[in-house]
Amino acid sequence: MNHAEEVAKFAAILEQKGLLSGIEGNVSVIDRETGHIFITPSRRMKLLLTPEDICVVDANGEQVGGTGRRSSEFFLHEAIYRARPDVRAVVHSHSPYLTAYALRYEDLVVPETASIRGFFPRMVCLPFGQPGTHEIHRGIENALAQCPVCLLGGHGAVSVSGTLEDAAALLCAAENTAKALWVARMMG
């Protein structure tokens, strides 16, 4: 499977699971040899994307492939790839429960008894940064050094990994954890 196929496939899976919604959220991978970033296009339903739709952006930030306009959150993905040479995949989501914590500007602290705690004991919530600008990734390097998932204050969440499958799986696990913690909070 090539990079564009991989991005289209996982974007569709994440939309089917309710972690990406309609035109919200974006998925990317980087080819570390060429520096090309393959990212979902802006304002497109992820379920309908084909590999030909996936935007390809070169190391100079120029779009060299794909249909439509690259995601407005390209700068977020680019900053993560620059800061973390070990990362090859980024998922940015507005999933309901992680976003609820982000809207409260609240770190998500996983209880010691939760089995998932080994993956992320604390998901840091960054201060608000204007979406689509360089502000949105302020502090992300430190947050992602602590945990492969972090919250973007007032906005959503990001997961990173060496593979897109793993970044997607981490986001799924983080959303389920956020949901369980939210329900437990509501139960008192």
Which role does the model predict for each range below?
Residues M1-G188:
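Glycine-rich flexible loops
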